[in-house]
């Protein structure tokens, strides 16, 4: 441990005397926390127990034992669009960190977040924001603890609100499309003089939707974090959803830390329909969509999958996200998609 690290530990232990602790573990026993150390038999891990600020949540977002099982609470949950926390149970955040040899000069610390109420996707969102806090040659542990204490709940709350709004929008679009298809089928059936078996066969063919071909590019790995881009040629939001569903049907993709995506396609009236989703990797989707727009893509969906390796990359992760997006888009532009893998079709 270098002098800067020692001074930071002294400061953290002084600021948080009741919640700071030092844990000495045998190498191999801490793998579930994402920590590894091949240089010594024992590894020092530090933990700070954080009570997050939940003042940003409204009454419908807070549960307790008195109302968690009644019908009124169920109605409140249905009307709530954000994060829900049961305050009658432990909602603490257990923040663990460990120093790398070159922290803070060239490397960030290794960190992990655990809480009984946090889902895996929640952890990914928080870790993504913590990555943004680290700057070369700057101590960052106190800043990370403060951010988790003051900002983490609000970030998750806003994330859940945006996800539910997006899901409602696509559900509404899907229902409208289904209704139009049903009306069209009824009209066609009334005007067709074919027999019943022919009509049934035609309806089955219409119900059978073909998923656009998914092309997967080469993966890039840095400090155990892996990035891989997937491309599909799409012409509608329905095709976008079919591709996303297909990718997420694979366990490998479903269990990834992030699956951010962006798409652009041209409508019949000539307008461009475009959208992006960060999937917890704040700012990633916007950069992907900018890349599509800059290349004037008009029928493209790109999904970038990231498997977090346990070591913060800071801004480097955006370099890999953008580069994998550019690489697979370049294969499309040069008619070289045959070089891609088709493993997720």
UniProtKB/Swiss-Prot annotation:
Keywords: Cytoplasm, Repressor, Stress response, Translation regulation. Translational regulator that ensures constant high levels of translation under amino acid starvation. Plays a role as a negative regulator of the EIF2AK4/GCN2 kinase activity; impairs GCN1-mediated EIF2AK4/GCN2 activation, and hence EIF2AK4/GCN2-mediated eIF-2-alpha phosphorylation and subsequent down-regulation of protein synthesis. Residues 7-155 form the RWD domain. SMART domains: RWD. CDD domains: RWD_RNF14. Pfam families: RWD, UPF0029. Residues 191-202 have a biased composition (Low complexity). InterPro entries: Impact, Impact_N, Impact_N_sf, Ribosomal_Su5_D2-typ_SF, RWD_dom, UBQ-conjugating_enzyme/RWD. Its main location: cytoplasm. One of its GO terms (molecular function) is protein sequestering activity. GO terms for biological process: cellular response to amino acid starvation; GCN2-mediated signaling; regulation of cytoplasmic translational initiation in response to stress; regulation of translational initiation. Signal peptide: none annotated. Residues 191-211 are annotated as: Disordered. Interacts with GCN1; prevents the interaction of GCN1 with EIF2AK4/GCN2 and inhibits EIF2AK4/GCN2 kinase activity. Interaction with RPL39; this interaction occurs in a GCN1-independent manner. Associates with ribosomes; this interaction occurs in a GCN1-independent manner. Associates with actin; this interaction occurs in a GCN1-independent manner. PANTHER family: IMPACT-RELATED, PROTEIN IMPACT. It is found in: Cytoplasm. Belongs to the IMPACT family. GO terms for cellular component: cytoplasm. It comes from Dictyostelium discoideum. This is Protein IMPACT homolog. SUPFAM superfamilies: Ribosomal protein S5 domain 2-like, UBC-like.
